[in-house]
């Protein structure tokens, strides 16, 4: 059609445009008639009136492609992909539809492939994303190989390269640590590598050496298994040693606590010894006082009753001393239990503090990790759609984030429970501390009161003994009895502890002082009486008898007073005994509770210590057993290695030579690596230059496209102008425009070819660089490379498959279109033949009246819509010319856009297929010609 259009430019409008696409069959009931059979319009009458020859006028517009006479069916575009069913086709095309090679009956995955506009939009989006990915890859390669910073717009979207460098640094640190851990087993690995090199040499020397290969593989498998087992055992040993160290630390801390308790017990024992010595001294003093009292009792024959009371008082003193000693022992025990409880509480607090610190540190670490992961996640949101590997990493990071969030929630819940427990325990500890402090203070006060009372009793007893020594005379027995009563009162007042009886004791003391004063007065009177008796024995016997009677009366009165005082003292003693009994019962119950609690805690601690010791013993035994087992394994392996080495000692020299050769080769490879790095630097520079050139070419392409658009517009204008004018000058201008268009097309094609060649060169360089990178990368990324290669193969075969399906669909549609054209052409020829027969038979109409009969008798179905013979006519040129419909123009534009997009997509698909084919070939280390 293009060839015919170039030959006959004026008849271009007569051609109908039928875009390639899927056609839905519809029966056109109102089919258009032949234009020659239509009646003559008013324009023909106007021409007859003007005495001009009549012109044939078409009934319908030639530009109306939808209501074309070429087809009986209406043209429609289907936006969906064709479902290649036989039942959907008409009965006329059954023979065509039967031959469906390389087609699928129902292709529903590529359901949008038949809609050219949607397909082109999707392909454009895919191509833009692929172009963007390729640019990112080129820039990443530049940064990795030459540390070249990108100064363009892609710099914003290359944040993940920094993450790659960080992961590289992390990998290097982890690799260094792993190498340090592997130093212990390097000797065995070197020996096995030597054996492997020997096996390789034997393989190269001997053709059929399958047994050695099998043995080598077995040895390698054994070595790998042993290395894995050794690694796992090392991990187990590390964990066990850590547990042992932790338990030893706990035991050491417990031993330190025990030492502290022992030291505290020693100090308490020393204090007890000092107290016992003081008690012994007091006992000696008491014995001395008792001896003195006995001597006084011997001297005082009349004071038998008072002596028995004094003995009772001494027994009471002994009982109180024994009670004091018991209370002191109880105090010591309570102090010991209090110290033990303190140490235990301190240990528990330390343990809880350590656990809290560990948990807090873990929480801080997790917070830092979460912040890093969130920053990484935010940075990777930008480059999610760029690469499949990044998607997988992002999914993994999402899973890790979900796991970390769940762990954080668990740790937060545990921390809450732990803090609640700590708060409860701290409250319990505070309560127990307060109770313990109150009990200790009460015991201290009680002991201080008892000690003060003892001191008072001792001092009072000493004073009274001195008074008794001074009063050795026989006639002062009654006064000594009074003094003994006062001693009894004072000893009983010692037992009163509380403040209620202090006032009564003070009253008794005042009364005793008054009695003592009375006694002193009576003694003075007795002395005076003695003197008077000595002086007046002879003369004043009667007076003395009277005085003696008066004195006897006074003595009787004093005795009555002493009896009253004794009754008061007895009542006070009863009250004090009751209070003492109550206090004893209270403190004994408290002491029993404390002792029971301390015993329970001791039992618990002993059980824990026993369990820890048993666990330690079991761990030590298991470790010893494991160590012996692995020692035996190591010894067996060493024996096997020694046997293998003894078998192959002869080949060590050759192995050493080959090792030296390999080292030399390694040095050469290092030199080559340095040269390759330099080449990479040059390549990166070339890449940067090529990118700049590509941008320049893009600018030139844009300019060329703009020039082409301008030229096409001018060409269309000139075309319209030439159609109106039809002069030779216009033909000359058209030729010039054609020449200019051809020049522009050649320039455009040359620029396009250069751009495509440079793109292919860049792709090849990219493949080479990826190959070099894959060679330089460690073995840990082999799985990722394998996954990438598999993905490339999947994309390659998918593209091939879709291209085949599309080509088959296009061929099918073209075949249907050509069949329709043939059918329409045959119908047209038949109608023309019938018309010729009718015109040959007609003789009514005379054609001689009309000039230029060749024009009217022409049967060209694609005749021009405009007759240039009427250019110089007086009436308007555009009267009988029909204007183009918007529908036809829109369909033409739509078809052009679709064809352009399909062509671009086809070209990009071919480039993508070639690129993937070369990449797969490079990954497989083979060359496809």
UniProtKB/Swiss-Prot annotation:
Q: Is Transmembrane helix a UniProt keyword of this protein? A: no
The opening ranks of the lineage are:
Eukaryota, Fungi, Dikarya, Ascomycota, Saccharomycotina
Task: Report the sequence similarity comment from the record.
Answer: Belongs to the SPC110 family.
Instruction: Report the superkingdom from the record.
Output: Eukaryota
Q: Where is the composition biased (Polar residues)?
A: 1-13
Q: Where in the cell is it found?
A: Nucleus; Cytoplasm, Cytoskeleton, Microtubule organizing center, Spindle pole body
Where is the sequence biased in composition, kind Basic and acidic residues? 34-54
The protein in question is named Spindle pole body component 110
Residue runs in coiled coils:
117-777
Subunit organization = Homodimer.
Tell me which UniProt keywords the record has, alphabetically.
Coiled coil, Cytoplasm, Cytoskeleton, Nucleus
What does the function comment of this entry state?
Component of the spindle pole body (SPB) required for the proper execution of spindle pole body (SPB) duplication. Potential role in cross-linking filaments or anchoring other molecules. It is essential for growth.
UniProt cross-references to InterPro entries, sorted A to Z? Spc110_C
**What organism does the UniProt record list as the source?**
Vanderwaltozyma polyspora (strain ATCC 22028 / DSM 70294 / BCRC 21397 / CBS 2163 / NBRC 10782 / NRRL Y-8283 / UCD 57-17)
The regions listed as transmembrane in this protein's record are none
Q: Which GO terms describe its cellular component?
A: cytoplasm; nucleus; spindle pole body
> Positions of the region Disordered?
1-66
Instruction: Tell me the leader sequence span.
Output: none
């Amino acid at each position: 059609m293009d060839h015919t259009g170039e030959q006959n430019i004026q008849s271009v409008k007569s051609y109908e445009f039928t875009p390639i696409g899927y056609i839905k069959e519809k029966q056109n009931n109102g089919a258009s008639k032949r234009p020659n059979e239509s009646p003559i319009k008013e324009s023909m009458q106007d021409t007859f009136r003007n005495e001009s020859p009549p012109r044939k006028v078409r009934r319908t517009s030639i530009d109306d492609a939808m209501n074309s006479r070429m087809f009986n069916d209406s043209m429609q575009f289907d936006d969906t992909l064709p479902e290649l069913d036989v039942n959907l086709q008409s009965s006329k095309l059954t023979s065509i539809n039967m031959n469906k090679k390389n087609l699928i009956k129902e292709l529903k995955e590529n359901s949008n492939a038949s809609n050219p506009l949607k397909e082109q939009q999707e392909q454009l989006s895919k191509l833009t994303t692929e172009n963007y990915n390729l640019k990112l890859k080129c820039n990443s390669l530049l940064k990795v190989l030459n540390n070249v910073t990108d100064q363009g717009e892609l710099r914003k979207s290359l944040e993940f390269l920094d993450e790659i460098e960080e992961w590289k640094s992390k990998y290097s640190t982890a690799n260094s640590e792993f190498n340090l851990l592997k130093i212990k087993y390097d000797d065995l690995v070197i020996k096995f590598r030597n054996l492997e090199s020997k096996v390789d040499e034997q393989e190269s020397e001997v053709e059929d050496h399958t047994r050695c290969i099998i043995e080598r593989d077995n040895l390698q498998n054994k070595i790998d298994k042993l290395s894995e087992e050794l690694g796992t055992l090392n991990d187990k040993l590390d964990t066990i040693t850590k547990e042992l160290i932790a338990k030893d630390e706990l035991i050491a801390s417990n031993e330190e606590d025990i030492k502290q308790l022992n030291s505290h017990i020693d100090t308490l024992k020393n204090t007890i010894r000092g107290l016992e010595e003081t008690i012994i001294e007091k006992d000696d003093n008491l014995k001395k006082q008792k001896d003195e009292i006995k001597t006084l009792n011997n001297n005082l024959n009349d004071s038998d009753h008072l002596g028995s009371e004094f003995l009772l008082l001494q027994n009471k003193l002994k009982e109180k001393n024994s009670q004091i000693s018991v209370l002191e022992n109880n105090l010591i025990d309570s102090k010991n239990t209090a110290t033990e409880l303190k140490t235990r509480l301190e240990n528990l607090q330390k343990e809880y503090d350590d656990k809290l610190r560990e948990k807090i540190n873990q929480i801080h670490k997790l917070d830092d990790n979460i912040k890093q992961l969130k920053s990484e996640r935010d940075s990777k949101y930008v480059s999610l759609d760029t690469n499949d590997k990044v998607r997988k990493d992002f999914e993994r990071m999402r899973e890790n984030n979900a796991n970390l969030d769940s762990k954080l929630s668990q740790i937060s819940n545990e921390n809450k429970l732990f803090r609640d427990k700590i708060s409860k325990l701290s409250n319990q500890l505070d309560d127990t501390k307060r109770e313990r402090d109150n009990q200790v203070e009460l015991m201290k006060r009680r002991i201080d009161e008892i000690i003060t009372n003892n001191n008072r009793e001792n001092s009072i007893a000493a004073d009274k003994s001195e008074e008794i020594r001074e009063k050795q005379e026989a006639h002062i027995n009654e006064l000594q009895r009074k003094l003994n009563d006062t001693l009894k009162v004072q000893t009983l007042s010692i037992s009163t502890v509380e403040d209620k009886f202090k006032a009564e004791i003070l009253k008794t003391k005042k009364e005793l002082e008054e009695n003592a004063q009375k006694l002193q007065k009576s003694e003075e009177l007795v002395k005076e009486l003695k003197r008077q008796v000595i002086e007046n024995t002879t003369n004043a016997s009667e007076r003395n008898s009277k005085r003696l009677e008066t004195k006897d009366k006074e003595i009787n009165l004093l005795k009555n007073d002493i009896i009253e005082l004794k009754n008061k003292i007895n009542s006070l003693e009863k009250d004090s005994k009751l209070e003492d009994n109550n206090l004893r019962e209270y403190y004994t119950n408290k002491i029993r509770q404390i002792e029971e609690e301390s015993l329970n805690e001791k039992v618990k601690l002993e059980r824990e210590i026993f369990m820890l010791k048993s666990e330690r013993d079991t761990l030590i035994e298991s470790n010893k057993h494991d160590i012996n087992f692995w020692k035996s394994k190591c010894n067996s392996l060493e024996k096997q290695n020694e046997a293998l080495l003894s078998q192959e000692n002869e080949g060590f020299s050759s192995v050493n030579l080959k090792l030296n050769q390999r080292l030399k080769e390694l040095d050469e490879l290092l030199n080559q690596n340095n040269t390759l790095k330099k080449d990479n630097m040059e390549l990166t520079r070339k890449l940067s230059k090529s990118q700049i050139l590509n941008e320049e070419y893009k600018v030139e392409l844009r300019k060329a496209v703009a020039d082409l658009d301008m030229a096409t517009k001018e060409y269309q204008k000139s075309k319209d102008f030439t159609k109106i004018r039809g002069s030779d000058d216009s033909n000359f201008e058209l030729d010039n425009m054609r020449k200019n268009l051809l020049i522009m097309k050649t320039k455009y094609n040359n620029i396009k070819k250069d751009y495509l060649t440079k793109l292919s060169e860049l792709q090849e360089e990219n493949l080479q660089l990826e190959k070099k990178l894959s060679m330089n990368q460690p073995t840990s990324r082999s799985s990722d490379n394998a996954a990438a290669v598999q993905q490339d193969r999947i994309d390659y075969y998918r593209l091939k498959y879709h291209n085949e399906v599309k080509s088959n669909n296009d061929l099918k549609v073209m075949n249907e279109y050509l069949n329709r054209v043939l059918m329409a052409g045959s119908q047209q020829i038949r109608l023309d033949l019938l018309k010729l027969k009718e015109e040959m038979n007609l003789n009514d109409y005379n054609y001689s009246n009309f000039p230029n009969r060749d024009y009217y008798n022409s049967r060209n179905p694609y005749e021009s819509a405009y007759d240039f013979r009427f250019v110089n006519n007086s009436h308007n040129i555009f009267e009988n010319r029909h204007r183009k419909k918007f529908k036809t123009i829109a369909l033409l534009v739509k078809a052009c856009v679709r064809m352009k997009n399909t062509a671009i997509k086809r070209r990009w698909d071919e480039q993508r297929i070639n690129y993937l084919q070369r990449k797969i070939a490079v990954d497989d280390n083979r060359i496809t010609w």
